[in-house]
């Protein structure tokens, strides 16, 4: 409802008090009022009951300073009532002195007399700083000729003077003496004003003489407050006057209470930022200090704290300083006595600490990377040499075995030469050429099988030299015995022996059956393998073939025997290890004669078919 009234008022509409109270639910009187009263506070002076605590904030001074009962309006602005002062505090005889606080620095006696115009003011005193006589302390005193002028001056509390809200209060003789003799100045007044206007602070009910200062740097304010307010608090003025300044903070030209509250909160926050937040005092005088806007105000405040010499707090602090001054001369004596004996230990400890600080890695030593790299390279080189030696040793062991393909190839070359010689001397038919071709193929296949079984790792090396072997063997020296000479000398003997051999089977059986060679072939093959000779092959031949074929075969057999002996000599000479020599020689000889036996069977079969 109050908000609606405010809105109407802002629009320029006015409302009577009775209507306003009726809307608010209060009990209004039965009398009627003018629609536009000059001062509704005069009309509600004797009004009893609940009254609205919300006030209009007008720019004009229509509702200014009417006396209102504070019990009826507990939170009314100060501008709506006269100051409620305990008359017991008022002086009974002149001088009637009023204390003026929160004065601007540029204030003069004439400006103060102008502020209290219409009042019987007799004198004005403005104390100055002892260190700087040109600078005011921020407070003063005004003496009035009569008590009514003093009461009127007290009603101007929290009025504006030079952009500051000054504090007007009653000053007794004890306060004046304390201010003048001890040069306490405006700090005491400031703290006393804060105590009076701060509704959050808890007042002290005992006098200054009963208790020492309680709150550190602000103890001087407590002293003055205790001495200044003890009587009126004890007389029951505590509930009256102390609660009054809580509402007196809002006094200035009908200003709205809520608006002033916001500024008060801002001033408290600002003052706490300045550094006075430790004090349990509200806004009031301190808030007006902030309006002054001068940093010198706070600097002077702290300077005066340092200059004060009247309080027991200062005496106590001076005693502390004296004890502190006596302390330092004794400290070196106490410190020098124990240091004289363990001086070396301290030096050793310092050196150990310095060494620890120097070696941030503790006991670790630096690593020579170059030496480490050399060691690693040497080790790797040794390992490589060792591996190379291990690879070379198997090569040396395998060298004797690598000679086997060479003597086999020589053997095959000797056979081929003997065969070519015998074939060139023969005048046989195409059956001989077919037998030679089959013999070569069987020899090659058998040699490949034996080589693969005996040496798997050397099989690739043995195959490539075959096409190159005729180039290597071409310049070889001729054999010890000439095969042509031996062939020309041996045929008559061989023919005789063959004739005698041929007679033995004919005498036993008469005629030779045509199927007999094929039946006796396997038996002859076994005899050839056991004996290691191919001489019985001549028994199967026909006597009508002539000495040419028989001599050619005998010569071929003898050349094979000679080649086998040569191969055995060549194998036994270069091989240093006997365990490897024996199985190699047996296997090679077995494979060689097996090939010859197969060739012999092929010849016998060919002859049988030819017959």
UniProtKB/Swiss-Prot annotation:
Q: Where is the composition biased (Low complexity)?
A: 348-359, 421-435, 584-597
* Protein's recorded name: Eukaryotic translation initiation factor 4B
GO cellular component terms, alphabetically, are: cytosol; eukaryotic translation initiation factor 4F complex
User: Which species is listed as the source?
Assistant: Homo sapiens (Human)
What role is this protein assigned?
Required for the binding of mRNA to ribosomes. Functions in close association with EIF4-F and EIF4-A. Binds near the 5'-terminal cap of mRNA in presence of EIF-4F and ATP. Promotes the ATPase activity and the ATP-dependent RNA unwinding activity of both EIF4-A and EIF4-F.
Q: Which SUPFAM superfamilies match?
A: RNA-binding domain, RBD
Domain RRM, by residue range, is 96-173
Q: Which gene encodes it?
A: EIF4B
Q: Which Pfam families match?
A: RRM_1
Composition bias of kind Polar residues appears in 487-506
Per the record, the domain of life is Eukaryota
């Amino acid at each position: 409802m109050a908000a609606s009234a405010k809105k109407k008022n802002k629009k320029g509409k006015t409302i009577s008090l009775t209507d306003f109270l009726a809307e608010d639910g209060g009990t209004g009187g039965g009398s009627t009022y003018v629609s536009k009263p000059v001062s509704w506070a005069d009309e509600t002076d004797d009004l009893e009951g609940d009254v609205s605590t919300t006030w209009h904030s007008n720019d004009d001074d229509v509702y200014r300073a009417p006396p209102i009962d504070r019990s009826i309006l507990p939170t009314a602005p100060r501008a709506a009532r006269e100051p409620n002062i305990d008359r017991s505090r008022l002086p009974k005889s002149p001088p009637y002195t009023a204390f003026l606080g929160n004065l601007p620095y540029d204030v003069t006696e004439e400006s103060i007399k102008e502020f209290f115009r219409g009042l019987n003011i007799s004198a004005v005193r403005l104390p100055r700083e002892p260190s700087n006589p040109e600078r005011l302390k921020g407070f003063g005193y005004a003496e009035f000729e009569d008590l009514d002028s003093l009461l009127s001056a007290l009603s101007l509390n929290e009025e504006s003077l030079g952009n500051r809200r000054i504090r007007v209060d009653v000053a007794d003789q004890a306060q004046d003496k304390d201010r003048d003799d001890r040069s306490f100045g405006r700090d005491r007044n400031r703290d006393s004003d804060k105590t009076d206007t701060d509704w959050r602070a808890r007042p002290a009910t005992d006098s200054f003489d009963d208790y020492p200062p309680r709150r550190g740097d602000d103890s001087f304010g407590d002293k003055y407050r205790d001495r200044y307010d003890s009587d009126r608090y004890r007389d029951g003025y505590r509930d009256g006057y102390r609660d009054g300044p809580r509402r007196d903070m809002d006094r200035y030209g009908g200003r709205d209470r809520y608006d002033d509250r916001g500024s008060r909160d801002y001033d408290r926050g600002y003052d706490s930022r300045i550094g006075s937040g430790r004090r349990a005092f509200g806004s009031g005088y301190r808030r007006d200090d902030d309006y002054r806007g001068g940093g010198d105000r706070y600097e002077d405040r702290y300077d005066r704290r340092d200059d004060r010499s009247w309080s027991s707090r200062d005496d106590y602090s001076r005693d502390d300083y004296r004890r502190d001054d006596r302390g330092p001369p004794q400290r070196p004596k106490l410190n020098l006595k124990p240091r004289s004996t363990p001086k070396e230990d301290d030096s050793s400890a310092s050196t150990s600490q310095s060494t620890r600080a120097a070696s941030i890695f503790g006991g670790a030593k630096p690593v020579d990377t170059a030496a480490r790299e050399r060691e690693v390279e040497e080790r790797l080189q040794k390992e490589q040499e060792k591996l190379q030696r291990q690879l070379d040793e198997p090569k040396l062991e395998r060298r004797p075995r690598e000679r086997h393909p060479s003597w086999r190839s020589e053997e095959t070359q000797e056979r081929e030469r003997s065969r070519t010689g015998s074939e060139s001397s023969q005048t046989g038919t195409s059956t001989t050429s077919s037998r030679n071709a089959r013999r070569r193929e069987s020899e090659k296949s058998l040699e490949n099988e034996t080589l693969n079984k005996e040496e798997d790792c050397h099989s690739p090396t043995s195959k490539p030299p075959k096409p190159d072997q005729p180039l290597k063997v071409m310049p070889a020296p001729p054999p010890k015995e000439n095969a042509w000479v031996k062939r020309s000398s041996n045929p008559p003997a061989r023919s005789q022996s063959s004739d005698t051999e041929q007679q033995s089977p004919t005498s036993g059986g008469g005629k030779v059956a045509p199927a007999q060679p094929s039946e006796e072939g396997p038996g002859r093959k076994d005899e050839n393998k056991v004996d290691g000779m191919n001489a019985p092959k001549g028994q199967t031949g026909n006597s009508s073939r002539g000495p040419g074929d028989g001599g050619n075969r005998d010569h071929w057999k003898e050349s094979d025997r000679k080649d086998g002996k040569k191969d055995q000599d060549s194998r036994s000479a270069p091989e240093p290890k006997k365990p490897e020599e024996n199985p190699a020689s047996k296997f090679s000889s077995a494979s060689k004669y097996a090939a010859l036996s197969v060739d012999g069977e092929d010849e016998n079969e060919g002859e049988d078919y030819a017959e």
